[in-house]
């Protein structure tokens, strides 16, 4: 293989032709070959489908290779992971059997994803990457560390445990990386991070990446980073390329609204967020009863089950994933083009990370928020903090806002009637999934009756139905929030205060149960 034809032997995947937003396309025109990278590393980069560096990669990779500490702020889904993985792989030496880079992340799923990126980009380098997280066998991790490990990816608690037992030797580790630094320096992890740093040499290089930088990050920077190179590619926190809508929906109407969205939207893959683990499992079951294959994941599940869900969802074996905020941090599944907040989040930070699961790497995405009347205060607060606008949901959502023109390039998950033979089970719960054709039932509160051909179509509702309350002014809130007082939930809700009546379904007065 000569210098001229070394690219010809690479197994380069098909080019992704989906449109991208300017925060990914607005680069300085550099290529990965402009950086002082090993040929073997470049081979892994190109075979992973990388074409040219994103803005955050253009800014961070040269400075990291120069040995500078880095504090980088960029929006979700713009290539932050490769921004620190590439310098780690470039600086690691395969013949030195010591840990040469530690990458800390807040969740187990993100650790698995990051380790996979390390292995993919570094597959020609002869480096060994190990992932270690809580919920897995400590004994197995200890045995694995008897073999050479060059890059260690893990969650803080397990890494501290291994370092304290003197199994993971960090005394000569030159590179310390924190992804999702805002979460890592919260009260939950900050003390652990400080203890881990005590095992490092004083001359280490530190790389911090995040979408938001609270005061805790600045305090950590002042204490532990040496003249850091600061990168800020977020003049505002608005997630470009993601269209955001809301609908005021009574609790018992949410499931029908979700069913209507399924019938109206063109979904490659969708993530649906709930605010509690109990609601995650119950919603997953009811989505299955609507006739859709569905996985769910939350923090109380066994680690092996979470791993399997995450892996199979990434592989496109299912269209819908219901989860708690477990998957809001850094998870990169580019086939996800729709995020639905079944429960509206309480904080702007949570909202930002949730909807950032769509529109990855500058591609188009759609975020829909199902809101109760009391959520309107949080809606206004989040809009103000993020400098964004969340619009009322229209009767028809333009597909060009979230669907790629070349759909053949996007993996298409299965629906129930498309599942491979052998998956036709009835409400079979295996700890983490609901798959198969459901039994027909019309007795579930808030759910439309099933028919042989699938869920019933959305129904138009007469806006005149329901109890009307006089308008109530809320000082300090814009006019669109100064609508009517919450309805008396004793019949049909007044449809004027809900966006798009076709997303509502009338309920008999006797049906007072709510989705709990």
UniProtKB/Swiss-Prot annotation:
A Pfam family that the UniProt record links to this protein: Helicase_C
Compartments where found: Cytoplasm, P-body
Lineage: Eukaryota, Fungi, Dikarya, Ascomycota, Saccharomycotina
Species the sequence originates in: Debaryomyces hansenii (strain ATCC 36239 / CBS 767 / BCRC 21394 / JCM 1990 / NBRC 0083 / IGC 2968) (Yeast)
Protein name: ATP-dependent RNA helicase DHH1
UniProt-recorded Gene Ontology molecular function terms: ATP binding; ATP hydrolysis activity; RNA binding; RNA helicase activity
Gene: DHH1
Motif (DEAD box): 179-182
First-level EC class: hydrolase
Gene Ontology cellular-component annotations: P-body
Sites where the protein binds ATP: 74-81
């Amino acid at each position: 293989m000569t210098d001229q034809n070394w690219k010809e032997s690479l197994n380069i995947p098909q080019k992704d032709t989906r449109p991208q937003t300017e925060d990914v396309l607005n680069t300085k025109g550099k290529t990965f070959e402009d950086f002082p990278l090993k040929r073997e590393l470049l081979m892994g980069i190109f075979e992973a489908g990388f074409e040219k560096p994103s803005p955050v990669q253009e800014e961070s990779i040269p400075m990291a290779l120069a040995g500078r500490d880095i504090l980088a702020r960029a929006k979700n889904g713009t290539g932050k992971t490769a921004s620190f993985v590439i310098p780690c792989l470039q600086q690691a030496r395969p013949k030195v059997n010591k840990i040469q880079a530690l990458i800390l992340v807040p969740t187990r799923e993100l650790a698995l994803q990051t380790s996979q990126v390390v292995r993919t980009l570094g597959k020609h380098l002869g480096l060994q990457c190990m992932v270690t997280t809580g919920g897995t066998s400590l004994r197995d991790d200890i045995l694995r560390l008897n073999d050479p490990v060059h890059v260690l990816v893990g969650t803080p608690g397990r890494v501290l445990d291994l370092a304290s037992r003197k199994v993971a030797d960090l005394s000569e580790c030159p590179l310390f990386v924190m992804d999702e630094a805002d979460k890592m320096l919260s009260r939950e992890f900050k003390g652990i991070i400080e203890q881990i740093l005590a095992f490092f040499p004083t001359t280490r290089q530190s790389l911090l990446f995040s979408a938001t930088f609270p005061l805790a990050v600045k305090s950590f920077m002042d204490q532990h980073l040496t003249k850091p190179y600061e990168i800020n590619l977020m003049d505002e926190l608005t997630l470009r390329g993601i269209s955001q809508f809301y609908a005021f929906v009574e609790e018992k109407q949410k499931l029908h609204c979700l069913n209507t969205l399924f019938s109206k939207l063109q979904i490659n893959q969708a993530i649906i967020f709930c605010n509690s683990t109990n609601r995650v499992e119950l919603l997953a079951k009811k989505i299955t009863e609507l006739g859709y294959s569905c996985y769910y994941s939350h923090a109380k599940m066994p680690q092996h089950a979470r791993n399997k869900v995450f892996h199979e969802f990434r592989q496109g074996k299912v269209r819908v994933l219901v989860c708690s905020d477990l998957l809001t941090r850094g998870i990169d599944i580019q086939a996800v083009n729709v995020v639905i907040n079944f429960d509206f989040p309480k904080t702007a930070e949570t909202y930002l990370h949730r909807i950032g699961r769509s529109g990855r790497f500058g591609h188009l995405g759609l975020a829909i928020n199902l809101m109760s009347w009391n959520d309107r205060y949080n809606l206004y607060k989040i809009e103000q903090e993020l400098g964004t606008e969340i619009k009322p949901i229209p009767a028809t959502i333009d597909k060009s806002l979230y669907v790629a023109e070349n759909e053949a390039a996007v993996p298409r998950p299965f629906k129930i009637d498309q599942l491979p033979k052998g998956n036709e089970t009835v409400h079979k719960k295996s700890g983490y999934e609901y798959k198969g054709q459901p039994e027909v039932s019309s007795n579930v509160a808030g759910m439309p009756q099933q028919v042989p051909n699938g869920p019933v179509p959305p129904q138009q509702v007469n806006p005149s139905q329901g109890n009307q309350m006089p308008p109530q002014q809320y000082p300090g809130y814009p006019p669109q929030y100064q609508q009517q007082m919450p309805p008396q939930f004793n019949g049909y809700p007044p449809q004027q205060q809900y966006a798009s009546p076709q997303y509502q379904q009338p309920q008999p007065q006797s049906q007072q149960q709510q989705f709990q």
